[in-house]
């Protein structure tokens, strides 16, 4: 019921996209229907080459649909000029190129270009918006730092601040966590989620980072070859099994119990007992080592940690795996 009351910031209806190669037409995506809601962080996921970049180009007005239409708040993007689109959609690309001697403050101020023109003269309102963008992304202290002298994570926050200063109702980001470490990836995605929720913006992120997307996204768009775009809450898509449409073949599956991508579990022929969390990690290590059969029962204990295998006892999983491998292939 709540979804019917949500504000639709962007909508695609019966969208077919492709390009011309020499004299032939190559269709990439067909009959797509989707809605992007204000106040939500939506993650677009799919294998390489499935058409994610093509879809983003269409949303940005860079390519025209063969069929169907894209609407921004009920207006067709084909009726909006470049300047108007720039005021409505803020974009952060994967590897933007900016002069290394440009400061963070100068970069963020560029976000006001669609509103000031290329003269770049900021009035008091523009300056307030730039300051707010720096504050909202918690990088005010970096205002005078050069882009070449800050970390990748800080640079990505500066790019997001520039997009905030642009003040579009839609924000589109292409792999914003690429090249970042684990903590920074979480931090950037949490920042984008907060921006969507607190500022009522519709935020669309193209990503391959499934684990972090599950933790932060309000909605997923799933794309795969030959199938319609699937939209839904990550949790609904996991429970229904639709999340597995992202996975090739049957080698991998998404574990509903553990909330992560795993190799398809092989037929394991051994008995293991002990505290649940210790059993899980011990079993995982044995499976990863390619060992499918252990003749004696395994007992895992903690405080202190130990693993018993018949009369043998080990104080680490590493020791157990080493021993099991010797039993399988004693020559080594």
Role assignments for model-derived ranges:
Residues 60:
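Helix-to-loop junction immediately C-terminal to a conserved catalytic motif
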Residues 68-76:
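Conserved ABC transporter NBD signature motif
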Residues 124-142:
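Conserved ABC ATPase "signature" region
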Residues 146-150, 154:
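Conserved ABC ATPase signature
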Residues 171-175:
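Catalytic Walker B motif of ABC-type/P-loop ATPase nucleotide-binding domains
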Residues 249-331:
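ABC ATPase nucleotide-binding domains
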């Amino acid at each position: 019921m709540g979804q019917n009351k949500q504000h639709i910031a962007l909508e695609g209806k019966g969208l077919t996209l492709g390009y011309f190669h020499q004299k032939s037409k190559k269709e990439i995506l067909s009959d797509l229907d989707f809605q992007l809601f204000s106040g939500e962080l939506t993650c677009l996921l799919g294998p390489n080459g499935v058409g994610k970049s093509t879809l983003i180009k269409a949303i940005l007005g860079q390519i025209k649909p063969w069929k169907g239409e894209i609407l921004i708040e009920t207006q067709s993007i084909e009726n909006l000029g470049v300047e108007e689109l720039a005021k409505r959609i803020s974009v952060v690309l994967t590897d933007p190129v900016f002069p290394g001697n440009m400061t963070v403050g100068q970069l963020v101020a560029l976000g006001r270009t669609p509103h000031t023109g290329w003269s770049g003269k900021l009035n008091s309102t523009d300056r307030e918006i730039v300051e707010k963008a720096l504050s909202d992304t918690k990088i005010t202290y970096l205002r005078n730092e050069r882009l070449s002298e800050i970390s990748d994570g800080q640079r990505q926050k500066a790019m997001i601040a520039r997009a905030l200063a642009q003040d579009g109702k839609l924000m589109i980001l292409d792999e914003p966590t690429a090249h970042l470490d684990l903590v920074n990836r979480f931090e950037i995605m949490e920042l984008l989620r907060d921006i969507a929720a607190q500022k009522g913006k519709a935020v669309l992120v193209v990503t391959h980072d499934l684990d972090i997307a599950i933790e932060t996204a309000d909605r997923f768009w799933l794309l795969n070859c030959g199938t319609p775009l699937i939209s839904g809450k990550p949790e609904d898509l996991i429970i229904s099994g639709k999340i597995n449409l992202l996975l090739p073949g049957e080698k991998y599956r998404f574990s509903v119990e553990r909330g992560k991508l795993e190799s398809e579990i092989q037929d394991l022929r051994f008995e293991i007992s002990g505290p649940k969390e210790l059993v899980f990690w011990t079993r995982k290590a044995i499976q990863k080592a390619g060992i499918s059969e252990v003749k004696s029962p395994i007992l895992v204990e903690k405080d202190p940690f130990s693993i018993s295998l018949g009369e043998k006892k080990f104080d680490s999983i590493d020791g157990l795996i080493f021993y099991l491998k010797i039993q399988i292939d004693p020559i080594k």
